[in-house]
């Protein structure tokens, strides 16, 4: 374990986190937990939390040596689970576990996380990086994300609101997102992947926060679901 490299990485994280913090969050870099305020404009606020990863899409990123978008996937997989319940993402935390800390590689991953938070309009308030050479094989890593959002109680999207006669709308995906990659890797095992296919495979998961929240603000949604991983 390279302590000096880890310390340098923490400084890099701190600089990025400060850029993505808003006035609702206390400046608590170096603390044991992140602190935030509940929006005062909400009369009966409910907190919605979600955690997720990006599955074996990580192996595609490793194979293509492209790490600057996998962080966007991580944010997307978490915040997209918040918005289908009517919540507006407020803050995000990440967990990176890796065989050996390679600063440039992990910086690119984190840059993607920061970009994802910017798209989702939420704050990156903390995280954890674990270097575990005895657990992960050479060059291997894994990611986990944690997102929290707020919603007014009456605006929660619950299945009880869905009724017969409702109009069903399907929103297209931007690609494979972050599901089904075990099958994809099986199909392309021991085969040369064409450049165009490579580009599609690593395309980041679309973050639907702006679109869904805008519609929900006008009370136009009774129910919402992510049709990924079985729906």
What are these model-derived regions, one by one?
Residues 1-231:
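Helix-biased detector of long, well-ordered alpha-helical tracts
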